[in-house]
Regions:
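Short linear sequence elements within intrinsically disordered, low-complexity coil regions
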Residues: 8-11, 15, 42, 60, ...
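Short, compact, well-ordered microdomains
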Residues: 85-115
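Compositionally biased, intrinsically disordered low-complexity regions enriched in proline and serine
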Residues: 4-7, 11, 38, 56, ...
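Short, conserved turn/kink motifs that form compact alpha/beta structural patches or helix kinks used as
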Residues: 36-95
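N-terminal intrinsically disordered, low-complexity, charge/repeat-rich segments that act as generic
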Residues: 1-39
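General "foldedness" signal
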Residues: 17-19, 83, 110
């Protein structure tokens, strides 16, 4: 099955702004996701990020399940990845969508379904 991976990516201008102390919704959401150890806020944060168009499609991965998507996105093999743009390793807050439109977010422990 083909899965699409979405990540919240920063532009160079956003990085410069954050470095200069500017507020950033992207950074706030990513920080909140990373600190949501119980996973209680994760889905709500993803919904905000989706509504604000903060996610960018970065890759399509051929895999049999979400765990394999996570593995391939972090250690390969590269032959199972079609890159759509600059991609970091798969981590907390990344969104994974299957061919049927089912979405899951990478949580601190496993995955959470996103409506």
């Amino acid at each position: 099955m083909k899965y699409t991976v979405y990540q919240i990516r920063y532009t160079e201008a956003e990085i410069d702004g954050i470095s200069a102390g500017s507020k950033s919704l992207k950074r706030d959401i990513r920080d909140d996701m990373a600190m949501d150890f119980r996973g209680e806020k994760m889905v709500g944060l993803v919904e905000i990020a989706l509504n604000e168009n903060l996610y960018t499609g970065v890759a399509e991965i051929e895999a049999t399940c979400l765990d394999e998507v996570f593995q391939v996105g972090n250690i390969g093999p590269e032959s199972q990845i079609t890159r759509l743009g600059r991609m970091a390793s798969i981590s907390v807050g990344d969104l994974i969508e299957d061919e049927d439109g089912n979405r899951h977010v990478v949580a601190n422990f496993g995955f959470k379904e996103v409506a």
